């Protein structure tokens, strides 16, 4: 599009723009939606089936994504591959040397995603579109139960019991006119969020968390360790003029 190739790092980002869908008679069928926005292709749960089908390499989508996204997704897929290799050592082995340990526990719902789809993997058409927002809405955490006058203090009704908010979390919601808006939680305590005044907030709006500040810090702080096995041999021999020592070392790579 426009002489730019996404495969060469010059994506025009057409999927993030909003469009009207008009028929041949000029009738507007869909107005102001991200019509080209698709959910993210995710076959995390099908890796073993794909490996059995002969796939030997898996591509992680990382174009225009931030570092925490790449770390999170790569770690998630890597653990899945490790589990398959450890369970079926006679069938599979890692293509790279060494072993990775430690680090954070990945959770792909907590970094950028526009929802997930498996597309045609089973030969059936699924739900692909993410037309309401080309951005990452995040995970739904609840709805607005109360607002102060200038809409800078929000009381939430959570959808679950184990939701914990953190100072600095990012939130999104759909405005009354169907647009996606967002804000940062400067102070989050229990079910209360304090933020800069956000006029488009309203009672009953569903609230999504698209930046989990605690998880972002965990990714940044807890790095994984890659270890490569090394074999060392040291020997000593007694000769006429005294002891002679030799040493050699080799790594698995």
Q: Residue locations for each model-derived region?
A:
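Surface-exposed amphipathic alpha-helical tracts and adjacent flexible/coil segments at the periphery
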Residues: 1-253
């Amino acid at each position: 599009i426009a002489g730019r190739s996404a495969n060469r790092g010059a994506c025009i980002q057409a999927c993030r723009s909003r469009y009207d869908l008009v028929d041949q008679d000029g009738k507007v069928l869909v107005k102001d939606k991200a019509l080209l926005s698709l959910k993210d292709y995710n076959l995390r749960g099908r890796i073993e089936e794909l490996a059995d089908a002969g796939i030997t390499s898996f591509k992680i989508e990382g174009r225009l994504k931030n570092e925490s996204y790449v770390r999170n997704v790569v770690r998630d897929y890597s653990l899945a591959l490790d589990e398959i290799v450890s369970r079926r050592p006679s069938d599979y082995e890692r293509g790279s040397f060494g072993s990775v340990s430690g680090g954070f526990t990945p959770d792909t719902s907590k970094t950028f995603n526009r929802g997930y789809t498996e597309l045609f993997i089973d030969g059936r058409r699924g739900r692909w579109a993410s037309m309401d927002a080309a951005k990452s809405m995040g995970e739904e955490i609840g709805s607005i139960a109360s607002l102060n006058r200038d809409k800078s203090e929000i009381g939430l009704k959570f959808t679950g019991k184990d939701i914990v908010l953190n100072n600095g979390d990012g939130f999104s919601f759909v405005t009354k006119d169907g647009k996606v808006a967002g804000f940062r939680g400067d102070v989050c305590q229990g079910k209360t969020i304090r933020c800069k005044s956000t006029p488009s907030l309203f009672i009953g709006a569903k609230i999504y968390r698209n930046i989990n500040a605690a998880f972002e810090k965990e990714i940044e702080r807890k790095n994984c360790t890659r270890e490569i096995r090394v074999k060392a041999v040291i020997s000593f021999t007694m000769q006429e003029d005294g002891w002679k020592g030799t040493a050699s070392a080799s790594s698995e790579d």
